[in-house]
Amino acid sequence: MWKGKAIIKLAQAFPNSRYVGYDVHGPSVAQATANAEAAGVADKVSFKQLDVTNGFSERYDLITSFDVIHDMVNPRKALREICKALVPDGTYLLLEINSKDKLEENAGPMGTLFYSWSVLYCMTTSLALGGEGLGTAGLPESKLREFCREAGFSQVRRLQIEDAFNVVYEIKP
């Protein structure tokens, strides 16, 4: 959740909407709540501690996630729960690391960075809890499309955003 920064920016830009942020880490939820209060958007924004693989209690028009699915213990289940939480014409906006399918396609400075983060944080975080251990280079577009199809999504569209580091997808139930 990065302490609520994305949701706070959205609430400032689109004040007629309601926003809910979720994170498994309680102290991050507390900090995000304080940040929303300081930004003057606490009446539009709430933050809750939740492991999304346990499901959502509400349905949403838009769900976003930023650089987190590859870290999850069970990314497939998380995607299933996200799909179930969207209204029929809703949208899941997913930002992930711009990794490629083949090892040699990830070679170079960015690949070095991706694999370093994977080994030192992303994979170990997931594997320590019995997860899949995808890591930053473990969720290329082909695998994401496979996971989304399994989760019940009908459409995955890669948005045309030029960024060597990240990729953004518009995903529909």
Predicted features and spans:
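Conserved SAM-binding loop
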Residues: 32-33
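Conserved SAM/SAH-binding beta-strand->alpha-helix loop
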Residues: 25-27
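Conserved SAM-binding motif I beta-strand of class I
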Residues: 18-23
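A short SAM/SAH-binding and catalytic strip from SAM-dependent methyltransferases
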Residues: 61-76
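C-terminal alpha-helical "lid/dimerization" subdomain adjacent to the S-adenosyl-L-methionine
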Residues: 95-151, 157
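A short acidic, Gly/Pro-enriched loop at the edge of an enzyme's catalytic core
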Residues: 50-63
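A short glycine-rich, Lys/Arg-flanked "PGG" loop and its adjoining helix->strand segment in the class I
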Residues: 76-88
